[in-house]
Amino acid sequence: MDPEETSVYLDYYYATSPNPDIRETHSHVPYTSVFLPVFYTAVFLTGVLGNLVLMGALHFKPGSRRLIDIFIINLAASDFIFLVTLPLWVDKEASLGLWRTGSFLCKGSSYMISVNMHCSVFLLTCMSVDRYLAIVCPVVSRKFRRTDCAYVVCASIWFISCLLGLPTLLSRELTLIDDKPYCAEKKATPLKLIWSLVALIFTFFVPLLSIVTCYCCIARKLCAHYQQSGKHNKKLKKSIKIIFIVVAAFLVSWLPFNTFKLLAIVSGLQQERYFPSAMLQLGMEVSGPLAFANSCVNPFIYYIFDSYIRRAIVHCLCPCLKNYDFGSSTETSDSHLTKALSTFIHAEDFTRRRKRSVSL
């Protein structure tokens, strides 16, 4: 198969290729011109408001700031940058794929989307590693889990994400077809296909494996603590549920789209086409909006399941409730988990040392 004939769009935003087959596939999806503008508008309004409130509540909250809050603020900023580009895509979907806002915004908006995708995945990975260190290795990780280290890590993530977005910036162009403008990707070359495959593996599937591994280790440690204590600790049981909810939300949001993208790249590298381009394109069109919606749901997830953030948001919106402490009975912050697991680990170490001394 000649890569020049590859018709499946390989970047993070799917339905903008000038290939006639793509336009035909896109036009046969009935919901795009009606449902997507409405859906993206709702995502834009709720996401912009939610992420602004989340950033403001954590940034201006008096007192000490949790280490995890630094990552959450950066994640909200990354989502916010993506969300401000959504009105451009609302206009594109409403105009049946036409791009009416010029070449600069064609390249710039696609670049910001790519930066957001990489930044979000890397930040989620760092948050998972941070929680792993805080819960599983609380004593050893004290010298690493510092505020200055968190800021350096976040700055590095932004820098790397901006570099990884450059291929998207260079491969995008405003193309005229039948005197109609389309924000499109250039023809796929063998080098681009290989780069897309390597980038997808190392910027999604490897971080995904890291996230799942970290949370599995955390869940194992929590279960061990629960069995060791022999108490029905509702806080720890709820913490395990939250861990799986976070992982499940990440998987539901991103795994379908990136799986179709992986199949598209592999199909483009094969001599024979094993997967129809129309099927892969349709899969990315259906799963793409689900992935993008993740940018607006994160503030609500944190508000519902993290009582620390819930209090910060309520105190930010209603300063009169500053002295009213609620939700403490369902606290699920990392500080609670760290204290509980630290006690458990110290008890385990003490038991081992005692057994060793007795045996000697």
UniProtKB/Swiss-Prot annotation:
Residues 1-33, 91-120, 171-192, 261-284 are extracellular. GO terms for cellular component: endosome; plasma membrane. Coiled coil: none annotated. Residues 55-69, 142-149, 214-239, 306-360 are cytoplasmic. Phosphorylation is necessary for YWHAE binding and efficient surface expression. The modification Phosphoserine is found at residue 359. It is found in: Cell membrane. The chain crosses the membrane at residues 34-54, 70-90, 121-141, 150-170, 193-213, 240-260, 285-305. Interacts with adapter YWHAE; this interaction promotes ER-to-Golgi transport of GPR15. Belongs to the G-protein coupled receptor 1 family. G protein-coupled receptor that plays an important role in immune homeostasis. Acts via its natural ligand GPR15LG, a chemokine-like polypeptide strongly expressed in gastrointestinal tissues. GPR15-GPR15LG signaling axis regulates intestinal homeostasis and inflammation through the migration of immune cells. Controls thereby the specific homing of T-cells, particularly FOXP3+ regulatory T-cells (Tregs), to the large intestine lamina propria. Also required for skin localization of thymus-derived dendritic epidermal T-cells. This is G-protein coupled receptor 15. It comes from Macaca mulatta (Rhesus macaque).
